[in-house]
Amino acid sequence: TANGVDSWDITPQPSTLTLDINEVGFFNLSVTPDIEAIAGLKSISIVSTSEDGQTVSSTSVTVKVNQLPALQVDKVGSSSKDVEAGKRVYYSFEVTNKGNAVDTFNLAVDTSTLPSGWEASLDQDKISNLGVDDNITLTDVLVVKAPEDAAADVETQIIVTLSSDYNASINSTYTSRTTVLQNYEPKLAIQGEDTQSAKPEEQVNFTIKITNDGNGEDDISLSLIG
């Protein structure tokens, strides 16, 4: 018997022994913790009862349930966002401790594939002592900044790896995708004189320079006012 082991598989083999005077017998006690067993020590009492139903003897064994770390990462809000060149965008996600013991989780940004000029950082790099089945929402924890000269429609993928402090090989990832918005900025300028004299029905010509100072290809149309 023991508290909290109702779903464990505890089996004595055999369950009954017949012994002569001074005879010694043995039985095998197999114990299998269930899949949701919490890590730690669990004492199990074994009671033998004579055929009179009243005379008993007892002892106990202890089972140490090993820690099995696990975690789950879920996005909060969108994991795909747009950003203006030179600006920042923020991402949020939720972390749940799916293991069988209190655990601490470490966060790290994978910068190995980060394009030149881009920046990615975390406002928090550790979740301390998260209980079993507890979760925490990390709001705006991942910060991604596009370079000033980022071209329109360029997409950058940022991966955050979260690993168990107990066993770093147990990890999960969060992936964000950031796309640069197009900045439309046509600039007009007069080449040469901006004022010319003309007689009635005499043509004069102006040269107008137009420059695309935006960050992407642009179809620019001209119109006359006045």
For the regions a language model picked out, list residue spans one by one.
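Long beta-sheet-rich domains in secretory-pathway and surface-associated proteins
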Residues: 1-226
